[in-house]
């Protein structure tokens, strides 16, 4: 394949959410692994304020260095915009919009955005309006997968095993006595629409609840309170192929007991991205019967949310079997992320994994489907 036949891929990263830095790190890893013989890459960063910037795509600028998190700024490149006009499909133009100089033209977008204003259906809606194919879930699945309440409702509607939970809407300050009795202790308090364990607290006494709710509301006015589930933390990757078939990866396990000297530790932001203290087992040391059950549930969860492209599904393995925790419609792609690791253990290397996602997006196209 010569250069003129390469697929032009816009890797979009950063964004307005509190997962901005992790999106940058994921994008750096993807930029390193997209096969240059097959793909011509355009790297587009979104600042925390929402400006789109055409960058040079240097992966080194998107890495965590000395515990310093990367960030897209207006100085990272040239500001641009994506017109919501299908007639200009894939054209990225300069600002101000009146100038309309075409800075780049792309065939497909890889939105490596984590959290609200990116992974939640917002950029997917923009790309649908603009008539540009994109990697990953559509508007509905992205929105439902981002909101933990509606993810659980969709899982439950399909008869999938989930844990107990309660939702605190903006008008509700705390849990009712009935909810406290039903959930028991400990509980985990989380922003309903967030990821990377940002704003998550483990509550062992009801005296700690108000502070935990306040911490979650620093990131989302809607809060979910989940009953703690005793069990091992398992994960499974799901990948849609260009022909529409869906496959599940080797199962992985995250072991976090006692990190940083605490028996009540969990897989929080620092453990995931800064401290390098969690232990990741790929494949997980579980019986084949359990692994098969997890893979089957992962595919059922993927279909329950009407996902497309890819997802990572997280579980707790309890004494009575696997319980679904959540689905990530755009999982992390950092060097320590489980999704590419699990597929590598399944015989799909990183460049091939990315190529499959892009090919699936192009095959799917745009519009209702």
UniProtKB/Swiss-Prot annotation:
GO terms for cellular component: cytosol. Pathway: Cell wall biogenesis; peptidoglycan biosynthesis. It comes from the Bacteria. Keywords: ATP-binding, Cell shape, Cell wall biogenesis/degradation, Cytoplasm, Ligase, Magnesium, Manganese, Metal-binding, Nucleotide-binding, Peptidoglycan synthesis. Its cofactor is Mg(2+); Mn(2+). It is an enzyme of class 6 (ligase). Mg(2+) 2 binds at residues 326, 328. ATP binds at residues 180-235. Pfam families: Dala_Dala_lig_C, Dala_Dala_lig_N. Its EC number is 6.3.2.4. Mg(2+) 1 binds at residues 314, 326. One of its GO terms (biological process) is cell wall organization. Binds 2 magnesium or manganese ions per subunit. Residues 152-359 form the ATP-grasp domain. One of its GO terms (molecular function) is metal ion binding. InterPro entries: ATP-grasp (IPR011761), ATP_grasp_subdomain_1 (IPR013815), D-Ala_lig_Van_CS (IPR000291), D_ala_D_ala (IPR005905), Dala_Dala_lig_C (IPR011095), Dala_Dala_lig_N (IPR011127), PreATP-grasp_dom_sf (IPR016185). It catalyses: 2 D-alanine + ATP = D-alanyl-D-alanine + ADP + phosphate + H(+). SUPFAM superfamilies: Glutathione synthetase ATP-binding domain-like, PreATP-grasp domain. Its main location: cytoplasm. It is found in: Cytoplasm. Cell wall formation. Belongs to the D-alanine--D-alanine ligase family. HAMAP family: Dala_Dala_lig. This is D-alanine--D-alanine ligase. It comes from Mycobacterium avium (strain 104).
């Amino acid at each position: 394949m010569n250069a003129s036949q390469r697929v032009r891929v816009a890797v979009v990263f950063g964004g307005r959410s509190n997962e901005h830095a992790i999106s940058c790190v994921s994008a750096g890893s993807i930029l390193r692994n997209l096969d240059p013989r097959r793909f011509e890459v355009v790297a587009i960063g979104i600042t925390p304020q929402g400006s789109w910037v055409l960058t040079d795509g240097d992966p080194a600028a998107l890495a965590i260095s000395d515990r310093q998190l990367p960030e897209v700024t207006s100085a990272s490149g040239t500001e641009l915009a994506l017109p919501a006009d299908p007639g200009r499909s894939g054209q990225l133009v300069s600002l101000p919009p009146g100038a309309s100089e075409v800075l780049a033209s792309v065939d497909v977008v890889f939105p490596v955005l984590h959290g609200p204003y990116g992974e939640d259906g917002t950029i997917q809606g923009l790309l649908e309006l603009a008539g540009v194919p994109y990697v990953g879930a559509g508007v509905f699945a992205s929105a439902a997968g981002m909101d933990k309440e509606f993810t659980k409702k969709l899982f439950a509607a399909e008869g999938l095993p989930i844990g107990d939970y309660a939702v605190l809407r903006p008008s509700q300050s705390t849990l009712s006595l009935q909810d406290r009795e039903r959930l028991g202790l400990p509980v985990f308090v989380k922003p309903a629409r967030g990821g990377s364990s940002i704003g998550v607290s483990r509550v062992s006494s009801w005296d700690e609840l108000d502070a935990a709710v306040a911490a979650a509301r620093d990131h989302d006015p809607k809060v979910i309170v989940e009953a703690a589930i005793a069990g091992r933390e398992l994960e499974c990757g799901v990948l849609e192929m260009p022909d529409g078939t869906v496959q599940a990866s080797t199962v992985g396990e995250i072991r976090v007991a006692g990190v940083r000297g605490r028996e009540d530790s969990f897989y929080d932001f620092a453990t995931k991205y800064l401290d390098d203290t969690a232990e990741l087992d790929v494949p997980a040391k579980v019986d084949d019967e359990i692994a098969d059950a997890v893979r089957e549930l992962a595919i059922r969860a993927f279909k329950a949310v009407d996902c497309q492209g890819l997802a990572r599904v997280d579980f707790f393995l309890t004494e009575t079997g696997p319980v679904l925790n959540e689905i990530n419609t755009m999982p992390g792609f950092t060097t320590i992320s489980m999704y590419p690791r699990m597929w590598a253990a399944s015989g799909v290397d990183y460049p091939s994994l990315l190529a499959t996602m892009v090919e699936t997006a192009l095959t799917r196209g745009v519009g209702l489907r």
